[in-house]
Structures are given as structure tokens and as C-alpha cells.
A protein has these predicted regions:
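Residue-level detection of the helix-turn-helix DNA-binding "recognition helix"
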Residues: 12, 27, 38-40, 64-67
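DNA major-groove recognition helix of helix-turn-helix/homeodomain DNA-binding modules
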Residues: 46-61
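Alpha-helical residues within helix-turn-helix
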Residues: 9, 20-21, 50
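Short, charged recognition helix plus adjacent turn
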Residues: 65-79
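Short alpha-helical DNA-recognition segment
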Residues: 16-35
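A short, Lys/Arg-rich alpha-helix, primarily the initiator
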Residues: 1-14
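Alpha-helical residues within the helix-turn-helix
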Residues: 12-13, 24, 53
Length: 79
């Protein structure tokens, strides 16, 4: 899983937050969020830490984990 897919997943998990909503919270353009989600750019360390605080996750979760698969596995365990 890529950083971009994880970011998109977290954004939707947080009440279907739009790219525009996230851009406003992060003080960047919507185009920047789009580039992050498409994996054509990555945030600098300060912005990455800010994303982690916003979504209550670790840098490791944000950049390395497959958050979608982890979420699905957790959901399947609860069923």
C-alpha cells in the first residue's frame, strides 16, 4: 500500500473529508493533496507529522502499512 492510498483512506474514514477540507486544515492547496494521494509528491516531515496528529496515526502507519487491508482484517475479526 502506498502513502497516497493510506492518506485517501484516512481522509474518507474521517467523515468523508474532501481534499479541499484537508488542504485547508494542512494549509496547502487542494492540488498538493491530490499529488500526495497520487504518489507524485510526498509531504515534508513537518506536514507528515501534522497529518499523523490529524488522523491519530504513526508515521509508520501512514507511510508503510496497508491501512485498508488492516481495517478489513479488523472488521472481519469482529464479525
Amino acid at each position: 500500500m502506498s502513502f497516497g492510498k493510506n492518506l485517501q483512506f484516512l481522509r474518507h474514514l474521517k467523515g468523508n473529508m474532501t481534499q479541499e477540507d484537508l488542504a485547508e486544515k494542512m494549509n496547502v492547496s487542494r492540488q498538493t493533496i491530490s499529488k500526495w494521494e497520487l504518489d507524485t509528491a510526498q509531504p515534508d516531515m513537518d506536514k507528515a507529522i501534522e497529518l499523523c496528529r490529524l488522523f491519530n496515526c504513526s508515521l509508520d502507519n501512514l507511510f508503510r502499512d496497508d491501512m485498508v487491508a488492516c481495517s478489513e482484517a479488523y472488521t472481519n475479526l469482529r464479525v
